Amino acid sequence: MTEEHLTSQEAAEGEEAVELSLRPQLLSQYIGQGHVKKDMEVYIQAARQRDEALDHVLLYGPPGLGKTTLAFVIANELGVNLKSTSGPAIERAGDLVALLTDLEPGDVLFIDEIHRLAKPVEEVLYSAMEDFYIDIVVGEGQTTHAIHLPLPPFTLIGATTLAGQLSAPLRDRFGIVEHMQYYQVEDLEKIILRSSEVFHTKISPQAAHELARRSRGTPRVANRLLKRVRDFAEVKGEKEISLETTAMALKQLQVDSAGLDQTDRKLLRTMILSYGGGPVGIRTLASNIGEDRETIESLYEPYLLQNGFIVMTPRGRVVTQKAYQQLNLPLPGEEE
């Protein structure tokens, strides 16, 4: 994995198996997202007491925050099966029909990147979610007719990084909507310590804190950096990952004190040096740094906004004083 992708919140090829090994099974084992956990505990308990399928759930927020993990935990807590797919993988309405008709009562259907469903596929979900049935058109010409297929009550869990791209008819059919937020450093420390046990690796509390501080509020990034720092510690012959080795490794990997990587710094530098700090429109910025608009909006901007490196204005993005300080660049008017 290249250095610029170490802090990407998107799952890299081959990481799914690692994430599966680290995945908690129950809400009591799930670290962070306290507001979401409290809500889901109530909703799950109520559904079980009524012996009903849980209402449909929409999880939205930046990548790497545990939306897929939470979907599996919800299914485990309900004691039902989970079938997992993604928006791009469901190419035709018939693919979705096959998934829906294979569900047992109470099962969970998880659709990642649900905002990327094709419109004809999405429309099949409307009646399935609302009234638990689908109409299938069969035959050709004068023999064309619709078959009404009832479905067992089920729970659809949709995950998206771009909730604003969901159509209103689809969004309105989710009874439970939860916003996954960036993790606090103390929660990331707990995740790193838990992951180190799974990896059979010891790490000092100070090193775990430093790693958590630079992990962009994202468990996926924390676990990825832990694996790389472990490599440096093992080569040095350390039996426990030290703070010194952690700092050295992260410097080598070009992850700075705020968790910014090369692309973050390139984005901020471009705004400052080429556009006087902004405002800058998204299309202009994407073209200048060689990234597509969706990547900037879903991977980079949320963290930069959350941590006060940029602000949004009606005319575009503007860097803050904090960004100048992080990059060691003079503020406007202070240039020599």
From Swiss-Prot:
The keyword Nucleotide-binding applies. Residues 1-183 are annotated as: Large ATPase domain (RuvB-L). Residues 184-254 are annotated as: Small ATPAse domain (RuvB-S). One of its GO terms (biological process) is DNA repair. It holds the Pfam family AAA_lid_4. SMART domains: AAA (SM00382). InterPro entries: AAA+_ATPase, AAA_lid_4, DNA_helicase_Holl-junc_RuvB, P-loop_NTPase, RuvB-like_N, RuvB_C, WH-like_DNA-bd_sf, WH_DNA-bd_sf. GO terms for molecular function: ATP binding; ATP hydrolysis activity; four-way junction DNA binding; four-way junction helicase activity. DNA binds at residues 293, 317. ATP binds at residues 22-23, 64, 67-69, 130-132, 173, 183, 220. One of its GO terms (cellular component) is Holliday junction resolvase complex. Keywords: ATP-binding, Cytoplasm, DNA damage, DNA recombination, DNA repair, DNA-binding, Hydrolase, Nucleotide-binding. Its EC number is 3.6.4.-. Residues 257-336 are annotated as: Head domain (RuvB-H). CDD domains: AAA. Its main location: cytoplasm. Has 3 domains, the large (RuvB-L) and small ATPase (RuvB-S) domains and the C-terminal head (RuvB-H) domain. The head domain binds DNA, while the ATPase domains jointly bind ATP, ADP or are empty depending on the state of the subunit in the translocation cycle. During a single DNA translocation step the structure of each domain remains the same, but their relative positions change. Homohexamer. Forms an RuvA(8)-RuvB(12)-Holliday junction (HJ) complex. HJ DNA is sandwiched between 2 RuvA tetramers; dsDNA enters through RuvA and exits via RuvB. An RuvB hexamer assembles on each DNA strand where it exits the tetramer. Each RuvB hexamer is contacted by two RuvA subunits (via domain III) on 2 adjacent RuvB subunits; this complex drives branch migration. In the full resolvosome a probable DNA-RuvA(4)-RuvB(12)-RuvC(2) complex forms which resolves the HJ. Belongs to the RuvB family. This is Holliday junction branch migration complex subunit RuvB. It comes from Lactobacillus delbrueckii subsp. bulgaricus (strain ATCC 11842 / DSM 20081 / BCRC 10696 / JCM 1002 / NBRC 13953 / NCIMB 11778 / NCTC 12712 / WDCM 00102 / Lb 14). The gene is ruvB.
